[in-house]
Structures are given as C-alpha cells and as structure tokens.
Amino acid sequence: MNVLGNYQSSGASWLSGGLGRFAYGEESYRPSLAFELNAEYRYRPLSSLEFKAYVQAQESNNSRSVSQVGIVELAARYSYDINFNQQVRVNVGQFFLPTSMENIDQFWESPYTLSFSSLNSWIGEEFRPIGLDLNYRHSFDDGNRLSAAVTPFWGNDSMGALLAYRGWSYGRQRTAYNDVLSVPKLMSLSDSGPFAGQRDDGTKPFGHDLDGKPGYALRANYLTERLSLNLTWVDNMGDTTLIDGEYAWRTKFSIAGVSWFVTDSFEVLAEASSGSSTMGAAPGVDISFYSAYLMASYRFSEYRLSARYDQFGIDDRDAMDQENNELGRSYTLALMWAGEESQFSVGAEILYLDSKRTRFLDSGDTESDTESVSLGLLVQYQF
C-alpha cells in the first residue's frame, strides 16, 4: 500500500484533463494526496507452471480519469529446461516486457525514485503486450547469461496517442486493462477538428484490438554479475486508416538499456529510446520521438540516494495545423529508506523540468509551458 503526497507547479495534471506534466494535481501550487493498493496473486500447480494476477486500486483527492480498480497484469508462464545451460520460457496473457532498467521491483515499481523516467512513465501508460512471449536463455559456464525473445501481441493499437496529443510526462501510472486516460482538449480533437472521431473521454491504451492484426517485439539481454545490457524493438503494426471510436496508430520504437554495478553499493543505469508514430490517412499525424536518461544510485546502510538526468523530444513531421513539437530535460534527486526488517519504506523526491511545448486548445487559447517543479513524498507498507 502506497500513500503519496505531491506539490507541483506544472498546472492541472494531464490525468485531470489538463496539460500538466505530472500525474497529480488539479492546479499549480496545490498539495495533492493519492493512495495506491497493489495486490498480486501467484499460483504454481507445477514447478514449471505459474499463474499470476496483478490488481491495482487507487484513489486521489484530485479528479482523475483513471479507474479506481483494475487489472494490470494477468498471465501464465511455463518454463522448460532443455538442459543444464538452456531454458525456454513462454508467457501468455497481458504482462510487462522486462525492458526497463529502473522498474525492477514487484508491481513494476522503481527502488530508485518516486516518479519514473519519461520513457518508463510512457511505457507504464501506453505499452503492455497482450499476447505471447517466447524467451530463450543460455547460461554460460562462467555464470553469464544471454537471452533472446520474440513477442507477438494485440490490444495496443492506440499506442502513440498520448505522445502526440499530450507529449511526454512524469509519473508512476500503470494503466489497467480497459482503462481510459484523459487527453487534452485540443482544437484538432474538437467536433469541428480533423480528428473529431476520437472518443470524447480520452484514449484507451489496452483493450479490444482495433484492427485484428498483431504487433511484435524483439529483444535481447546479456547479463553478468555486475552488468546487464538490453536491446528491444517494438512495432504495433497498427492500421493508421482505422477509426473505431479510437484511432489506430502505427508506433515503432527501439530501446537500449544498461545497468552497471560499479561496486556493490554504487550503480549506474541508463536507457535510450527512439521511434515514430503515425495516425490517419494522409495528411495525418506523423511524429518522431526520443527519450533518454542517465541515473546514478548509491546505497548506504538502509538508504538509497539516486540522481537522474532525463531528456526527451518530439518532432512534428506532418503538414497538419496542430502543433506536436516539444523538447525538454529534467533533473531528479530522490532519497529512499527501506529497513531490512521493516514493512515500511519512505521516499522523498524533487524533480525540476525545463521544457518547451505549445498546444492549440478547442477554446481558441494557446497553452505553452517552460519550467516546473515537482516535490513528492512516499510512504509504503508491504504486507
């Protein structure tokens, strides 16, 4: 169970229908409070077969578009040992791909910071395969491991909508199945706009597949005692001409990640992603995007101190009148405490964001942002 307090200067949160970069707050300089309850059930009828369900409940003193209760993961995993050095694993259902270098704890939590990087904030919001993951792993005699995986998936056709309409954000949202997230009230989404077919209440990242065609992901990992290297490629193969209460997007991106334990206490990790997203028959939306972060983390006694530098951007490549360009960078400092024999943990974070983004609203106004700050506190109880 998590209790989160936040104070920020970015305006009304995007989850409240605004253009604020952060997940909490209906206006700037107003404290907000949120509660998260994450529950996981695992059942293992055989040593090689496991069923998993991850359910999330959340509440806030702000008006937010997310459901109070929802299923985040529901999957079955089968493992088969070919021999002493080789193993095959099959995952079926909806699940997080193990691409993130920072979201490594249970419930896709981060032990480093309260808010996720811009890249993993977006992954938590808009990308979670519903399909089959086939993973092959080879263990070398020296203990190092090399794995490769392929993942055909469905139900992620709207991936890219939040990036194009809203832009990058910072938070800890893990969108549940069939949940609907707010999008800004843009001129292009109004009844007289070119994309009036978008559902009025927002966008649904995960649910019924819109075009019936699978997307796919490819990834590889190399793991040693102190080093982990990840490479991932994702293409949702969306039919950009389809409108079914929601527009289908064709979103493709790559991720490269590294985690290096310089010492037992000091870790350096980084991820970089680059991709593109298109929607609609020409002249539709066409953007390219990137996000990258570098983080250093030091553990001492029962504490962890982490510093993260994050940079992101979107390049609007289409000829439409709406504005999708943006550029930003942030600096995050977080201190976390977790007692070895305590069920409680506590964290505090400050995030400074310098960004450039302009959006044309259906009211006729133009909204731009520059600098903003987020202060966060977290109290966590595990039982």
Q: Each PLM stretch: what is its role?
A:
Residues L4, E26-A164, N221-E225, M295-Y298, ...:
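Outer membrane beta-barrel
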Residues G5-L33:
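Surface-exposed strand-loop-strand hairpins of Gram-negative outer-membrane beta-barrel proteins
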Residues S13, S65, E102-Q106, S158-S169, ...:
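Outer-membrane beta-barrel and related beta-rich outer-membrane complex signature
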Residues S13-R21, V69-I71, Q106-Y112, A164-Q173, ...:
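Flexible, surface-exposed loop regions and adjacent strand-edge segments
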Residues G18-A23, T113-L119, G197-P205, D239-L242, ...:
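Extracytoplasmic loops and strand-loop junctions of Gram-negative outer membrane beta-barrel proteins
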Residues E26-L33, S65-G70, S121-R128, H208-G212, ...:
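Short sequence motifs at beta-strands and strand-loop junctions characteristic
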Residues W122-T224, T232:
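Aromatic- and glycine-enriched pocket-lining scaffold segments that form the walls
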Residues G212, N221, S228-F383:
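Outer-membrane beta-barrel pore domains
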